[in-house]
Amino acid sequence: MCNQMFIIRYSEIGLKGEKSRRQMENILIQNIKSELERYNIFPEFKKSDGRIYIFTDSKLLYDILPRIFGIKSFSHAEEFKFRTIEEIVSITVSKFSGMISGKKFAVSAKRSGSHSFTSMDIEKILGDALYKYSAGVDLEHPDIRIYIEIRDNRFYLFTEKIEGPGGLPLKSEGKLLSLFSGGIDSPVATYMVMKRGSATDLLFCSLAHPVDTVQMLMAAKNLLDKYSIGYNAKIFIIDGSKLVTAISEHPDQMYTNIIFKKLLYEYAEYLCEKYGYNGMVTGESIGQVSSQTPQNLMLISEGIKYPVYRPLIGFDKEETINYSKSKSLFMNQSSAEFCSLFSKNPGIIVNHKDFYNEIKKFNVKDYMQELVEIDKNTIDDYIKSIKNKRFRGELDNVEFIDLRSGSDYENWHEPGAINLNLGELRNFIEHADRFKNYVFYCKKGLNSAYAASIMSKHGFNAYYVSERDLKSMQKN
C-alpha cells in the first residue's frame, strides 16, 4: 500500500538557525494550507529533514505550489513502508518496469536515517534490477530519471522535480508598502520584495478615477491572486486629481513630475507610520525617466523617514519586461504613465533650492485624499462598483474636446472638436451645457480620462477615448 503525496523542498530556509528555520517552515505550511483550503482541500502535513510532505493527490497543487514563495522545488511522489532492501527493489521494479520499456533510464537516490546500505548501493542495486526492462542506462540524459528518497523505514518514488519560485515564505520578513501604478515596473518590484518574504500592501494614487483605478486593479489582481498566497494584501487608493489640476495651472512646469513623486512619497510615509510598515517599495530605476536621475531620486527621498527599496534600480526596461513576462505579470493593456499628465519638458537636473521653494506650495494632505481601502479578496466587487466612462461611439448630442497639442489638432481632429488644455478645464466646466454628452480625447487616453472624471464629478455626462480608438471608430 502506498500514499500519494507531494514532497516540498526549500533552500534558504535550511540555512537559518534552528528557531528561525522552524518558524519559517511553519509560515510556509500555513501559506500552503490557506490556499488549499480555498479549494476545500485539507491534507495532512509532515516535516522531516528539510522536507515538507503534503498527503494529497490533488492535481491543483501543480498550479498552486509554483507560486508559493519559499519553495525551491516539489515532486508528486508515492510513499511506501519497507523492512528490507529487497522490498524496495520489488516495489520499484513493479512501478517502473513497464514505464522504462524501450527507454534509457537513470536512478538518483538520497537517504537519511540508519541503514545497512548507502545511497550509491541503492542506485546500483535498482539499476541492475531495472536494466533488463529498458533500452539501457544514460546517467546524463535519460528518457526517465527515477528518484528515490529513503527516510528511516519509508521511501518515496517520483520521476520529476518541478521548480518553485524560491525565496522566503511570505510574511516571514516584515511588512512593506509598494507605490503601485499597475504599469510594468511596480508589479515586478512588488513581486521581488514579496519573494524575499515581505508581506506587501499597495498604494495607488488615482489621477483619473475611475479609469486608471480599474487598470491598476486589474494589474494588482493579477499579481496578488498569483503570488500573495497566505496574505490578504491591502490596497490603498487615493485621489490625486486635485494635484493634477493645481499642477496643470502652475506657471512653472519644470518641477511638476518631481513634485508629484515627492508628495506621493510623503503620503506613503504617513501610511508607513500609521500602519507600521518597515519601508516603501518603488519600481524606479536609474535614468529611466526624468524623475529617476540620481539627483532627482535623492531629492525625492530626502527627509523621508522610512527606507525606500528599489529592487529594479539597475534594470533597463527590456530586462524588466522580460522578467515581468517570465513571472506572468506582464499585462498587454494600454496605460500611460502619470507624467503624461504633467510637464512635457520636465527638469532633468533640478536646482535643490528652487525645488524646495516650489514644494512648499503643496501640502500633501491638501492634494491627496484617500478614496477607499480594499483588499485582495474584494477587488472584483470594487471593480464592478466603478462606473467606467470609456466612450464606445454610441451617444447623441456629443461635443468632442481635443486635449492634444495645437500642432496635433491642426494635423487632424474630430470634426467640430474644440482644442483645450487641462489648465483651461475649470473655466470650460463653468460654461458647459448640462444637456450635452462630452467626449474628451488625447494621445493615450489618460489626459482625457482625467478630464472626464473631473467633469463627471461636477454632474456632467463626460467620457474619454484615446486618439487611436477614436480614429478606429471612424474607420468602422
What are these regions (language model features)?
Residues M1-L177, P187-N232, Y382-S385, C442-K444:
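RNA-binding accessory domains that recognize and position tRNA/RNA substrates
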Residues I184-D185, N447:
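Hydrophobic/small residue at the entry helix of a nucleotide-binding pocket
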Residues I125-L130, K161, G166-E173, Y227, ...:
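Active-site adenylate/phosphate-handling loop in enzymes that bind or generate adenylated species
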Residues N40-E44, Y277-Q292, S301-G303, I313-E358:
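Mid-to-C-terminal catalytic subdomains of enzymes
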Residues G406-N437, K444-N476:
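Rhodanese-like catalytic fold shared by cysteine-dependent sulfurtransferases
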Residues S94-G98, A246, F391-E394, L425-R434:
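Short amphipathic alpha-helix with an adjacent loop that forms part of the alpha/beta core around
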Residues K110-S112, F362-N411:
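Flexible, polar/low-complexity N-terminal or interdomain linker segments that lie immediately upstream
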Residues K221-H250, E337:
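A conserved beta-strand->alpha-helix junction
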